Amino acid sequence: QKQRMETGDYGPSESGLFEVDSLHRVIRDVPKPTIAAVNGFAIGGGHVLHLLCDLTIAADSATFGQNGPRVGSFDAGFGTGLMARAVGEKRAREIWFLCRKYSAQQAFEWGLANKVLPADQLRKEVRAWADEILKLSPTALKVLKQSFNTDTEHFAGIGQMAHSSLKMFSETAEAREGITAFNEKRSPDFSAYRGN
């Protein structure tokens, strides 16, 4: 958000935005299961990244949540679609529309995390899961992953549309208010935009 505030974009890229959709594609296309190890915050874009991973293991001290609408941003592709698949439409809307933080235990109970354990055991557990996966047929795993991803591939197109919309939206006063408030550590005042 600081980069976006200071320069109007997310850093050097062809479009001017951080090419997060390319990162999403890499996570989905790598022909092996991916494991998100969450130790700290999985908020906003980090929350979407863990959703994109095939498995999520979290430290019991981890915090999850969305903050896009709070800072004048959104992920209307994988961030909404995969969340609704994981937790149900109503819960996904709650997570996005209210921008609350929730615990690793809540993430586990809602189906967003596969396992929660003490932070000092996280690295060892992720390694154990990876070692277990390495004993399995790589071709079978690849085909299984492709099968899971094919069912949600339409979210990629929606995400590309949303990414273009975000680029346009990021140039508005409303988006600037969200970014400025975030960087100034204050609540944004979006009252002037209620009629949109």
Model-derived regions: residue spans:
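Glycine- (often His-adjacent) and acidic-residue-rich active-site loop
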Residues: 1-26, 42, 70-72, 153
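A general structural signal for well-ordered alpha-helical segments in protein cores
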Residues: 20, 80, 89-92, 123, ...
